[in-house]
Amino acid sequence: MGSTISPPSGEYLLEMRGINKSFPGVKALDNVNLNVRPHSIHALMGENGAGKSTLLKCLFGIYQKDSGSIVFQGKEVDFHSAKEALENGISMVHQELNLVLQRSVMDNMWLGRYPTKGMFVDQDKMYQDTKAIFDELDIDIDPRARVGTLSVSQMQMIEIAKAFSYNAKIVIMDEPTSSLTEKEVNHLFTIIRKLKERGCGIVYISHKMEEIFQLCDEITILRDGQWIATQPLEGLDMDKIIAMMVGRSLNQRFPDKENKPGDVILEVRHLTSLRQPSIRDVSFDLHKGEILGIAGLVGAKRTDIVETLFGIREKSSGTITLHGKKINNHTANEAINHGFALVTEERRSTGIYAYLDIGFNSLISNIRNYKNKVGLLDNSRMKSDTQWVIDSMRVKTPGHRTQIGSLSGGNQQKVIIGRWLLTQPEILMLDEPTRGIDVGAKFEIYQLIAELAKKGKGIIIISSEMPELLGITDRILVMSNGLVSGIVDTKTTTQNEILRLASLHL
């Protein structure tokens, strides 16, 4: 299915041809191709569940393909482990970094293959070899530093340098910028381009369309386990890529705004967190049926606002007024009782219990309310409410007993939102609600948010994606270094104005 630009044989570093893989009852990959040239950055895109992960697991030998061939540097290969693939020159930098935090940078670089001098590890050689690679890639990190003291972006650099130390010809990067600042992203892109100049083929996986156009030369698109197209980025636009990914044209990235903000339901005045550095003197109003965005650069303390409102952080001063009555949320339970709900930023670590089912994950925030008169859990009500979450949030799942970790990121997020709606909140706060979610699922999340606002919920959204804030909010509160630097009307503001305000107190 689809079309490709096919150069003469031998121009590819990696050729995955006609890869098929089935699981019981599921055709995961159906005749999928991926061809990567040297000196190129190749985007691999598709919605969650399109087959990207399965294809790469077949490449690394984690899954054995049913049929098809893998040709690397002109030779057919069939790896049986990621270690074997790495030793042959194919490396992957995972979204979840794979480093030993308690060990030094150079220990992590050469783990399992330390240079030796006699019976001992040659520390000097390990240091010099690490420093030489870092110098070549313009990485400014002390090889002796403990990894646990470094930023996420620095850890990314170490993973890339480690791949380089194996003389990797193919480097696969899975959502490498998901936790990076703009400055860190630019540095990462510089290093990726250096790898390209040295002849590497980079496979770049990201849901951030702007990055794809900024960085990549070619793109392969998968949908529902099928190969759709491999084409140069030149001549493509965002709408064409989205249409190929989702199988239909998305005429709009954001739903129409049908909500009509009403009376003020939440008044925040001079809110300051006890633990500093954090928020200071934060004031704003939230109206019934309003979607209020919170923007700011990394470190602006956006998350601190919602954590303080939700009782996770203690306030030292200021007032929170709900429907004209002053309240105090000393704990999350108090906040829930006052009608607040918080969808946290880190879905995997603080949002879901990955190995438990949808039922448990749907009900856990409200579990005490399911006890009957004799103190036992009311299974009938629990099953009914779980089904309500699945139906009303439009969760794609075989059933409520399905392990939530097996769902796509978009469907996991729908379950989390549904879980909080069961607490019947008036104020719904969402921190980076579409991070790591594909473009089709993003639109569905936006639709849910718009529907909730239309029903009168007061909604606060924190997002690092400026187009998202401009596309779905009514107003945007801009934070800078813990202070409110402005509140703007979404209809009349610009991205440049928001960035100017975000830099005001740096």
Swiss-Prot record:
| InterPro entries in UniProt | AAA+_ATPase (IPR003593), ABC_carbohydrate_import_ATPase (IPR050107), ABC_transporter-like_ATP-bd (IPR003439), ABC_transporter-like_CS (IPR017871), P-loop_NTPase (IPR027417)
UniProt: ATP binding residues: G46, E47, N48, G49, A50, G51, K52, S53
Query: Which keywords does this chain's UniProt record carry?
Result: ATP-binding, Cell inner membrane, Cell membrane, Membrane, Nucleotide-binding, Repeat, Sugar transport, Translocase, Transport
- Which topology term describes how it sits in the membrane? Peripheral membrane protein
The broad enzyme category this protein falls into is translocase
The record places domain ABC transporter at 14-249, 259-506
Give the CC-aspect GO terms: plasma membrane
Give a yes or no for keyword Cell membrane in this entry.
yes
| Subcellular compartments | Cell inner membrane
Top-level taxon of origin: Bacteria
EC number(s) per entry: 7.5.2.11
Question: Which reaction(s) are listed as its catalytic activity?
Answer: D-galactose(out) + ATP + H2O = D-galactose(in) + ADP + phosphate + H(+); methyl beta-D-galactoside(out) + ATP + H2O = methyl beta-D-galactoside(in) + ADP + phosphate + H(+)
Q: What Pfam families is this protein classified in?
A: ABC_tran (PF00005)
* Activity regulation, per record: Stimulated 3-fold by galactose and inhibited by vanadate, N-ethylmaleimide, and 5-methoxyindole-2-carboxylic acid.
Q: Does the keyword Cell inner membrane apply?
A: yes
Gene Ontology MF terms in the entry = ATP binding; ATP hydrolysis activity
pH dependence comment: Optimum pH is about 8.
List the Gene3D superfamilies.
Answer: P-loop containing nucleotide triphosphate hydrolases (3.40.50.300)
What is the protein's major site of localization?
A: membrane
Quote the function comment for this protein.
Part of the ABC transporter complex MglABC involved in galactose/methyl galactoside import. Responsible for energy coupling to the transport system.
Task: Report quaternary structure and partners.
Answer: The complex is composed of one ATP-binding protein (MglA), two transmembrane proteins (MglC) and a solute-binding protein (MglB).
Similarity-based family: Belongs to the ABC transporter superfamily. Galactose/methyl galactoside importer (TC 3.A.1.2.3) family.
Q: What is this protein called?
A: Galactose/methyl galactoside import ATP-binding protein MglA
Can you name the source organism? Salmonella typhimurium (strain LT2 / SGSC1412 / ATCC 700720)
Q: By which gene is this protein encoded?
A: mglA
